[in-house]
Amino acid sequence: MEYDGFPLSADQYERLTTDDLMQLLTEGLSDNPALAEKEPKFVLAICHMLNDKAQINAEVRRRRTFAIISHPDAGKTTLTENLLLRGGAIHLAGQVKARGDRRRARSDWMKIEQERGISVTSAVMTFEYKGVICNLLDTPGHEDFSEDTYRTLTAADSAIMVIDAAKGIEAQTLKLFEVCRLRDVPIITFINKIDREGQDPFDLMQEVSDKLALDTAPMTWPVGQGNRLKGIYDLTQNEFISYKQGETPENTGLSVTSNEITRFLSDDELTTLKEETELAQGACSPFDLELYRAGALTPVFFGTALRELGVDELLDAVASFAPPPRPQPSSARDISPDEKKVSGFVFKVQANMDQNHRDRIAFMRLCSGKFKRGMKLKLSSSGKSIGVHNPILFFAQDRELVDEAWPGDIIGIPNHGTIRVGDTLTENEDLIFTGIPNFAPEILQRVRLDDPMKAKHLRRALESLAEEGVTQVFKPQLGANWVVGVVGRLQLEVLAQRIEAEYDIKVAFEQAPYETARWVDSDDAAELKRFLDGNVASMAEDRDGAPVFMAKSAWEVGYTEEKWPKIRFSAIRERAPAAA
């Protein structure tokens, strides 16, 4: 691969973009017409690289990896069901709180999720729609599980934000939006539940614009709402989609100027529709693909997921203009999807998805290259290579072995605890994907075991569940009790139920003598040792063995920081381990 004209290594050539390779080859042949004759292997190798990149790029362009975010009860799970229905992943859409023979929401597979009708863990579902491969990440809506949601958003290239038409933008929606903004994740807005009485659509558009500091581009518009709902109007196609309660929405193909539209709308309704759509298009921004993908503009769709109105238009938008897989930041460089070597990162580990097998699945977002079943990948946390022999694609609990996968795909890797959240897997490259955080817990509780004979089993259970990254586990330097750290109290309930259901161990939680925790480190090793030795009663280790300062109050954190200026106290810790 090397000669005097282009003295680069093979790896460096492979990292070049398609345009750069084409320019290199064109200029090389132009400057030296005899290049192909003198260096046939070099020219052939460049041509092979171009062919490989073309194959990868063709698959990348077909993929949309997106998350759905919302406040609890905004209708996210119902929307998820309807998207899956349209993608052929399921054949019957059911309500979350099902009765009789109606099915539970397919993405809510954990027992407590089924009982409460909320998502507390991120489900990954893959389906095809109009030739586009959709990788849908159904994130937890409950605020106690925001950390899991944050990590899931690191794997998404775009997001659908679901807003309740009656309630507008709620607290959790705003928090999740800020996470998307930090990562420059473009957002499509779906204003849901227009079959109920809600806020004025202009007020909702203004709220999105004001609270999120985004330009808004209306793509569909409601024709009435609540009992007066007659459908939606597709502003991009100038078509009226009719709705009647109890019937499937019908795309009439009629514009507001068509005489036949009066079969569906009264004169007053038609006049209102004309006035509102004209005002909406005049007052709001036109859709701009570049602004949307830059995170500066959100296209807005109206509908009701429960009645299946507006869902087709939303999914068409995802397929048409949501971004394909993007370059991902790493410790070495931004990794382009069309790089030949395979790379990916683990944003989630789920234990015991199958009660019969006590399994542990690592969810890996592929970032570059063509993945093939059976290939060996280097694990950043250990530096060792592991064979990926049984990679799987997901639909809730349903699994399917996959022979190949491409950038943007989410594959599951069964393992016995060797792969952890934040791990990078590469085709023998020394790099680490960045931006997968661990947050300091807001609630700390001691674990009380009813049966002391099961202490070893409890340790295994806690370590296994901690690998999922939602619940954190700390071992104090003094005392025998484990301490768990969570964001909200619902997590404690989930933890206790899962330990009992999956490990047959009954536990209870009691108040720990700590209020908060901070990871500590220092550039001065001697100073760090003095701090650790002088604060043994307040020190613990997390599951990675990192030292953690357990404080009785936020005031104590501040006081200790002033007392030990050379020690760093961190509320957020990067989960990616140091490369071996």
What is each model feature region?
Residues 29-38:
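Charged, low-complexity interaction regions
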Residues 21, 39, 46-47:
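Generic L/I/V-rich hydrophobic alpha-helical segments across diverse proteins
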Residues 49-580:
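Structural and coupling elements of P-loop NTPases
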Residues 13-25:
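Short amphipathic alpha-helical heptad-repeat segments
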Residues 1-2:
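Intrinsically disordered, low-complexity linker/tail regions enriched in Pro/Ser/Thr
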Residues 6-13:
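Short, charge/polar-rich alpha-helical segments
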